[in-house]
């Protein structure tokens, strides 16, 4: 299967929101809000348009990845800019076929070419360690409360960039979504039934798990 990667265009916006909704529906909780995140991220000051990519198969958009600016702060109060990606969305019928891998690898190469040094994300280690991500604790990166979430992962694009300090990750506030606005936005799409999937319990456990 040939996968084409290119920058997202304005006329792709709704298609990307639709595929994101399909990709995440009922995965983390009944329904989803990732399509609303995509919608608001594009107009947020932390958005990095140069790292906004879509994946196409036979001319059809089947995947998307987006990045936002974030920070890490050390024990001296010094801040360094890092970047974070999410959501990474792939239409269910195209998952496990290399689409997500192509988006992640392509965008990481571009991030390196742009001079970015570190990427910090939240995600399941099983999905991201194969790209070089490690538990954030391995790089002395905690959350803002000084704890090490199981799902917080990082990669140094420039090796050694974070040496000799303890860091706290400060994500973009764009990820703090207004649930009422998200529900309102979802009503602009065709109605979908919600339900339970085991992945919702897995997500709940992961969100409450920490590395000591």
Placement of each model-derived feature along the sequence:
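A short beta-loop-alpha structural element at the N-terminal edge
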Residues: 3-16
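Active-site rim helix/loop that mediates acceptor-substrate recognition in acyltransferases
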Residues: 17-20, 24-72
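Internal, conserved structured core segments that host functional sites
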Residues: 51, 55, 86-89, 115-124
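Short loop segments at secondary-structure junctions
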Residues: 58-59, 93, 156-161
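A conserved beta-turn-beta hairpin within the catalytic core of GNAT-like acetyltransferases
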Residues: 71-84, 95
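Conserved acetyl-CoA-binding loop-helix of GNAT-fold acetyltransferases
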Residues: 85, 90, 96-109, 120-121
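Conserved active-site alpha-helix within GNAT-family acetyltransferase domains
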Residues: 113-117, 122-147
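Acidic/histidine-enriched, glycine/proline-rich intrinsically disordered or flexible terminal extensions
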Residues: 161-212
């Amino acid at each position: 299967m040939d996968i084409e990667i290119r920058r997202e265009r304005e006329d792709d916006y709704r298609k990307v929101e639709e595929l994101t909704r399909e990709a995440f529906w009922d995965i983390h909780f009944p329904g989803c809000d990732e399509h609303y995140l995509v919608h608001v991220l594009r107009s947020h000051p932390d958005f990095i348009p140069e790292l906004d990519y879509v994946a196409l198969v036979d001319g059809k958009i089947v995947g998307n990845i987006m990045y936002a600016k974030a920070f890490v702060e050390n024990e001296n109060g010094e801040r360094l800019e890092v970047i974070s990606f999410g959501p990474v969305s792939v239409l269910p019928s195209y998952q496990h076929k290399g689409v997500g891998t192509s988006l992640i690898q392509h965008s990481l190469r571009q991030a390196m070419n742009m001079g970015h040094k570190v990427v910090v994300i939240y995600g399941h280690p099983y999905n991201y360690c194969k790209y070089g991500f490690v538990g954030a604790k391995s790089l002395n990166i905690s959350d803002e409360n000084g704890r090490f979430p199981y799902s917080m992962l990082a990669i140094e694009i420039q090796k050694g960039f974070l040496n000799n300090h303890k860091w706290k990750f400060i994500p973009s506030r764009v990820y703090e979504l207004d649930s009422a606005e998200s529900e309102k936005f979802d009503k602009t799409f065709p109605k979908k039934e919600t339900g339970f999937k085991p992945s919702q319990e897995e997500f709940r456990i992961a969100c409450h798990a920490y590395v000591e």
